[in-house]
From Swiss-Prot:
Gene source species: Aeropyrum pernix (strain ATCC 700893 / DSM 11879 / JCM 9820 / NBRC 100138 / K1)
Protein purpose: Possibly the antitoxin component of a type II toxin-antitoxin (TA) system.
Keywords: Toxin-antitoxin system
Listed InterPro entries: AF2212-like
Protein name, UniProt field: Putative antitoxin APE_0472b.1
Family: Belongs to the UPF0165 family.
Amino acid sequence: MSEIEGIVKSGVIIPLKPLTELEGKKIKIKIVDAESVDAEKLYSYLRLLREGEDARDFFKI
């Protein structure tokens, strides 16, 4: 079992790192903590994710 951080956008949890090892598996999610994030940083981060970049190193989210 591993701990994965993510962001919620429009009701969907977006992981902050690729989850290729979980592809096709059913998972159970437990929310331990919730923090607010800067909307401008979030938009830039999500744009890079859509372009296929690993954006975690660029932003402190």
